[in-house]
Amino acid sequence: TMKHVGLNVAADPFMNSSLVGINGGLVLIVADDPSMHSSQGEQDSRFFADFAMIPCFEPTTQQEAYEMMFEAFEVSEKNHVPVMIRIVTRLAHSRAVVHPFEHDRFVKENTLSKADRMEWMLLPALARKNYEKMLQKQDILTEWSNNARWNPLTINEKRRDLAIVTSGLGRNYYLENLQDYKDLCEKQFQEQGLPSTLHIGTMPYPIDSLKKLAKTAKTILVIEEGMPFLEKMLKGILPQENIIIGKLSGHLPRTGELNPDFVRKALSLEVNPSVLSSSSISDTAANLPSRPPQLCKGCPHADSYSSLNKAVSLLKESAGSDNVAVMADIGCYALGAVPPYNAVETIVCMGASIGMARGAAQAGIKYSFGVIGDSTFIHSGITNLIDAVSTKTPMTVVILDNSIVAMTGCQQTILPSSQLETLVAGLGVEKEHIKVLTTNPSKIDENTRILVEEAEYRGVSVIILVRECLEAFRIRNKAAKAAKV
């Protein structure tokens, strides 16, 4: 499981996994984030599934997500391909009662036979053959999609002006407006009724159903969550005489999440006066006192940024503002970019801080800092630090070690904090320029002094600022108390 930007990091093995002979089911659940609630982009993972030429499921409800998981494994095992299940923020953050399958649906664990070694060697000569096999599977996968129950088609021969295609949560928002839309259609089109509809829950797309739908109407409205991926695809699949409308045509917004109000407008429905529209809610919220995100009270990062800001101020006094750069990374500590700290200048992606600090130093900035969390450093910072060491770049890496993966649920880091110093030394940083410091209010001035000293060093220095996350402390305490009971 991962979110969309996590798939970016996994792109190399992901793309190549479609070319090897998957021996047993392999299913990836990827969560996209329309409206960027906790991400730096709205990218749509369906592009990746299409790029890799693998099947993709897009559930509409929690029940569908549950049931699709079973079929995803079946499709993967039968066709020896990885399968993606693409969800979005709104579905990932929701709950509902799910009716499980009967126990006999579960297959007992079987021992897999060893895979053919030739299926797992992507040397050019073998990779070409595997690529041909993948292309041959496309017709089989398309036929499966044509018959999949996740793609219900409803044809109304009487209504010829419009047809509707939905996918994912777009179907929910259409159904939410269905009764009002039905009333409107009866009023405007009398006995012609509702337009023909096709809901798409799988990729490759069900070509047969799409072509049947295209014959019923000239104009097709596409309601999808995320980028206009399906809308673009239909323009290449369907005849040119079909007019495809949706996000690209301006009938639905290109940015942010879909909601029932946006779909309502696309269906030419008036906003229900008895229900607050999304825009009205936004206007109301704009007049409320703001509560911007901030570090938790007692967060160790607060003291770390206090030390860093003091050090940066001293360095700017001696070298000028343009000779100091502070690059940060993705994590709780990204909140160091906002008041009251305003401590960092860049936040791009996981691991970028060290690489950007190295670039700044090589571009001539005298004092360059890369601020990164302990878990992010292990995830994406190690190779950048190796690069900096190999080029003897004058820069300072500040690792904020709170002993936990705090931002995404307080998971344990894959390497204990006690081993960070050993790891950094093993990457080639000189031991006298690796400083492990406790960060708390009483240590701010001392830590400031050490930050300034290490910034003056004309090579790579690493400062590890250590204090346990308060939430991690609470979890550990709670577990300890429970163990005693």
Where are these regions (language model features)?
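Thiamine diphosphate
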Residues: 1-77, 317-406
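A glycine-rich helix N-cap at a beta->alpha junction
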Residues: 21-31, 108-118, 390-401, 420-433
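Short beta-alpha connecting loops at secondary-structure transitions
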Residues: 32-35, 52-57, 247-252, 292, ...
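Flexible, low-complexity linker and terminal segments
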Residues: 59-295, 300-301, 449-458, 462-485
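Short acidic loop-to-helix transition motifs that present clustered carboxylates
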Residues: 64, 199-207, 228, 332-333, ...
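Active-site lining segments that contact anionic ligands and/or coordinate catalytic metals
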Residues: 80-82, 159-162, 218, 321-323, ...
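Acidic, Ser/Thr-rich peripheral helices and adjacent loops at domain boundaries
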Residues: 103-112, 345-348, 352, 412-425, ...
